[in-house]
Amino acid sequence: MGPPLAQELTQACNQPLAATSNLQPDDGYKIELRAENGVDKYPAKQHARKVAAQIRQGKGLIFLMGQKSTLHEDSDQERSLRQRRYFFYLSGVDEADCDLTYDIKTDKLTLYVPDFDLRRAIWMGPTLERKSALQKFDVDEVNYHSALDEDVKKWAKNQGPGSTIYLLHGSQGPTDNPSNVIIDTKTLKLAMDACRVIKDEHEIQLIRRANDISAAAHIEILRGITSMSNESHVEGSFLNTCVSLGAHKQAYQIIAASGSNAATLHYSKNNEPLRGRQFVCLDAGAEWNCYASDVTRTFPITHQWPSIEAKQIYQLVQEMQESCIALVKEGVRYLDLHFLAHNILIKGFLTLGIFKGGTLDEVKKSGASLLFFPHGLGHYIGLEVHDVSPQSIMAQGINDDSNNMLILPTCVSPCTTSSPALTSGMVITIEPGIYFSQLALENAKPEQLKYIDMARVKNYMAVGGVRIEDDILVTKTGHENLTKVPKGDDMLEIIRQGKKGNDSHHV
């Protein structure tokens, strides 16, 4: 069930790729994608210098191993490559069996590629060759892997006793560590995490492209949802569009959850029928050159709001998200946005009669809102979908006691008390949600149930869950929303126009 969008796109070097569809090309949503040929090299050398500056030592050797090619257990089939992200950050290389060194003192970044293997080249295609690798990647020198250990020994000899080799993990170092060097396995990760949290322009463009591809896939599903009958069709359509646009990998397991399945945060079966259900919650994001996107939209299976309750919950989540996004700028403490989202939820539930018999602060202190919004507002995004955070420092701001209940153990940076304030170059997600989980409600504490009208809640159980998620770049003047997928009434209009196109194809 391939989406028409994927069939219309032409991937020619230096040609724009327009995400249009013959279902309804005039619905106003076109995602323009441009081929990457001609884009500057991934700035590996710049990253190496940033990391060295964080290490704050005038000399030493950074040593990073790339991912090795391996077979599945008890099989002759290779595992799909997922490059080690720390290695990629200092190399830009997404190929197996490579390593690198960076000499801090001489500012020399060296890439080591596999030695030529004729048999493997015949079966799998040639691996990287020194000359082409030097042209392709932002490194100073390329050597074959067989020279690595000897090169490290020569470096250690020239440096003298007490020189330091910085490793990410003790098991990921030279085969034969020189005896006169210090092996440091703590400093490098902290330094790289501090660098990775602030994206440069090249990284932002990669995240932007991943988002554009994801947007094209999400929009195509909105256009076709009325003709789909199973969660698997939603997942298949998303994958089809992404692969057609050159994104062969997903940043994470696709969540295509309909009805009550959407109350399971990381639902992944994606195999149940859509009939009789109100919403689909689609959490899916393409990966581009190892950089992630993370996009969630919740939409009706028909071309209209399926119930008054569904519309009420959707609009409340949309208010939570848009209110939080509007406040994103440098200096803001992300955790305060998380608290704001809970406040909006509680006020909304008091208005709807789902919460009763208490003030906003009383309900908040009870933790009742956590039964319906049981995760953090979002996270960093980059080389990982839940990207690394800088070394924890106590963020400015005082935590109101009434908010303490809302800081969950599952909250990840920047949604923690120790996360730094938002800074230009950070890319974060804003992803509030409201879920009606039977399991959560059955295990609620008495102090939470005190403020919940369970008879009223029953009217909302069929909604399942609603989550809306965008990727937000923090800028010096505020923020930029990198996710170009419509919401609310604009979303419904695309579904309506898509239904017209689908109906015309069946005449």
From Swiss-Prot:
It comes from the Eukaryota. It catalyses: Release of any N-terminal amino acid, including proline, that is linked to proline, even from a dipeptide or tripeptide. Binds 2 manganese ions per subunit. Its EC number is 3.4.11.9. GO terms for biological process: proteolysis. InterPro entries: Aminopep_P_N, Creatin/AminoP/Spt16_N, Creatinase/aminopeptidase-like, Pept_M24, Peptidase_M24B_aminopep-P_CS, X-Pro_dipept-like. GO terms for molecular function: manganese ion binding; metalloaminopeptidase activity. The keyword Manganese applies. Mn(2+) 2 binds at D283, D294, E469. Keywords: Aminopeptidase, Hydrolase, Manganese, Metal-binding, Metalloprotease, Protease. SMART domains: AMP_N. Its cofactor is Mn(2+). It is an enzyme of class 3 (hydrolase). Mn(2+) 1 binds at D294, E431, E469. Belongs to the peptidase M24B family. Catalyzes the removal of a penultimate prolyl residue from the N-termini of peptides. This is Probable Xaa-Pro aminopeptidase HCAG_02413. It comes from Ajellomyces capsulatus (strain NAm1 / WU24) (Darling's disease fungus).
